[in-house]
Amino acid sequence: MPVLVITGTGTEVGKTVVTAAVAAAALAGGRTVAVLKAAQTGVGPDEAGDAQEVARLAGTATVAEVARFPDPLAPGTAARRAGRTPVRPEEVAEAATKLATEHDLVLVEGAGGLLVRFDAEGGTLADVAGLLDAPVLLVTSAGLGTLNTTELTARELRSRGLELPGLVIGSWPGAPDLAARCNLADLPDVSGAPLLGAVPAGAGSLSPAAFRSAAPHWLAPPLDGTWDADAFGDRHGP
């Protein structure tokens, strides 16, 4: 099944911009792409959410949400506060499966980190990936503190028998500090997975045309790009 689940080590690590970059690179390669947001929180009914931002940046991707809730909280908490039925992992998996019959690639973007709860029963994005038997791309931050959250997420994925094809740094700084430079080597070591890209900080503020043109250069060949981890490390490592 052509489904890739995208999660992060936490909030604000660049998941949506990375999702847009993966979509843009796949579209540039001639594939049809759908982006499914499992649960959108923190936006009103008439506001653009993460899926719409992906479409704005990436281009002609099909976008969908399973549910959205107004409070900027974990999906389970936001659903409870709104008095609404929470999202169930089975719903997300069903929606992704349907999209997969009509598209070459389906990107399922989570909310927050891997184990953020969808419902009172403890359903998470990890359960969605398990139901779909889909690989999980992990978006990480560049700097100090990322090694612990990255390793914890990688361990959880493997404990569930889920595939971790690689990591993408969601916001590579223009002037990386020593920790960020060292992490280029340390992130693959602690996670047991290769670096598959680094999206520059501020990429989401580019014009859609500039974003689409640049996206393949931020991602490695397994993600339809031309980025080379060794060359990047030679330029930016300590």
UniProtKB/Swiss-Prot annotation:
Family, as annotated: Belongs to the dethiobiotin synthetase family.
Keywords in alphabetical order: ATP-binding, Biotin biosynthesis, Cytoplasm, Ligase, Magnesium, Metal-binding, Nucleotide-binding
Cellular compartments annotated: Cytoplasm
Pathway field: Cofactor biosynthesis; biotin biosynthesis; biotin from 7,8-diaminononanoate: step 1/2
The organism's place on the tree of life at top rank: Bacteria
GO biological process: biotin biosynthetic process
Oligomeric and partner information: Homodimer.
Single GO cellular component term: cytosol
Residues that, per the record, bind Mg(2+): T16, D50, E109
Catalytic activity annotation: (7R,8S)-7,8-diammoniononanoate + CO2 + ATP = (4R,5S)-dethiobiotin + ADP + phosphate + 3 H(+)
Organism: Streptomyces coelicolor (strain ATCC BAA-471 / A3(2) / M145)
The keyword Ribosomal protein belongs to this UniProt entry's keyword annotation: no
Residues that hold ATP according to the record: 12-17, 50, 109-112, 170-171, 200-202
Function of the protein: Catalyzes a mechanistically unusual reaction, the ATP-dependent insertion of CO2 between the N7 and N8 nitrogen atoms of 7,8-diaminopelargonic acid (DAPA, also called 7,8-diammoniononanoate) to form a ureido ring.
Protein name (record): ATP-dependent dethiobiotin synthetase BioD
Enzyme Commission number(s) from the entry: 6.3.3.3
Active site per database record: K37
Top EC class for this record: ligase
Binding site for substrate: T41
Cofactor(s) annotated in UniProt: Mg(2+)
GO molecular function terms noted in the UniProt entry: ATP binding; dethiobiotin synthase activity; magnesium ion binding
